[in-house]
Amino acid sequence: MGDWGALQTEHPSDYNFVSAQTNTGARLSLTYANTGHQRPWFKSLTVKLHGGYLSEGDTITIIFGDRSGGSPGMKLQTFCEPGFEFKVLADVCAVGHYFPLPETPHISIVPGEVHEWKAVLPSLRKIGEPFRLGL
């Protein structure tokens, strides 16, 4: 999850609000932790199903940056990544053993519109010494 903002489930009008639902109406709870799983997936969102089970064909839909409650959406990482992967693991027997699913969703993180340019220059150079200008 790079350097993006922490996910949250308490304030639907704030950035990074996450929600989840099932197609069966089963009750879910969400917990986000910065160090909730093993490396390299330290940041983790845990979805727990309460008072029931899922059968083949049932689904859980997770909405990152859910805007239905007024959230402006997600603050994503500051660098581009063509194949950002949402690693999905499942504890199908509810015993604390999580196994990765073979197919995981992914998105492309691309730059947005430029709002401000900043020149990055070296602070110490001699007269006539070449330097690089970075934007």
For each predicted feature, which ranges?
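Ser/Thr/Pro/Gly-rich, low-complexity intrinsically disordered stalk/linker tracts of secreted
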Residues: 1-123
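Beta-strand-rich structural segments
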Residues: 126-135
